[in-house]
């Protein structure tokens, strides 16, 4: 499984948000395919946490690219973001939905749900995504359905597919950011067309 390098994240946030689709989020033995993301472009983006300036809560956003920004909402759900662009730019990509691939149980069609299913909590905030137990990788496995648990499992680990899996990307406004004035209408949510695990069409 080829881990994404730092340079992948140190690029335009919209590009990263689109190209994270189809990649694998790995936490320990749990694996899920990213099928929906949202881009948050920095302090000028009124929907972004960084628009309020640097705080203890959002400090990870101001750090180097390729780190996790994990925060809690409603006092009970965690959301995971991936920090993008240069250090201090304060932009990130929210992971909104995953397709379960290996040893993932429970719903994954929402940012809080996917964190719960993947065992992600605030202890992973500011975690380097180039580590060994929590990272994002290219999908270079050949998978099959496991009839007993209705999960995917690798049948040819490490065997590269002859061509990357292709899919159509849909763009929509982000969810739950009505307060962000004109930024609420920007099409900065991306998902894989036709995927059953997307949080909202």
Predicted regions and their residues:
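Conserved, well-structured core segments that form or line functional sites
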Residues: 1-144, 148-154, 158-201
